[in-house]
């Protein structure tokens, strides 16, 4: 759930990220360098209100704070994100893993789990 509306209803964010360990924060940077990693995610806008967009995300890479840093760098901070947003939200961070899937390490069987977000703000806006 992000504040604002992405320019396109679906797309791919491809950025370079630099992790600042003392700050415990990740930044989008313009140039490669020591510690800089490529970060890629695909997104789809599922629903919108006047102020919020409910976004589905598929990570192609899994960097620390990747979703938060990439959306915030585009002035689309996650609702409730006190680290990457200057907005004062009266909610917890609105980042929810709706579905998780992986192959079981012993059996190789595909494992799939899903769960709806809680029925609290901002999820109740949709």
Predicted features and spans:
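RNA pseudouridine synthases
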Residues: 1-126
């Amino acid at each position: 759930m992000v504040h604002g509306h992405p320019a396109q209803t679906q797309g791919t964010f491809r950025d370079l990220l630099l992790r600042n360990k003392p700050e415990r924060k990740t930044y989008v940077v313009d140039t490669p360098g020591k510690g800089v990693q490529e970060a890629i995610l695909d997104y789809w806008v599922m629903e919108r209100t006047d102020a919020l967009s409910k976004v589905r995300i598929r990570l192609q890479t899994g960097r620390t704070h990747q979703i938060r840093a990439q959306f915030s760098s585009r002035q689309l901070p996650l609702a409730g994100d006190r680290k990457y947003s200057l907005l004062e939200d009266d909610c917890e961070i609105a980042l929810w893993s709706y579905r998780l899937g992986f192959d079981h390490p012993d059996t190789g069987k595909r494992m799939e789990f899903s769960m709806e977000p809680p029925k609290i703000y901002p999820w109740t806006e949709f």
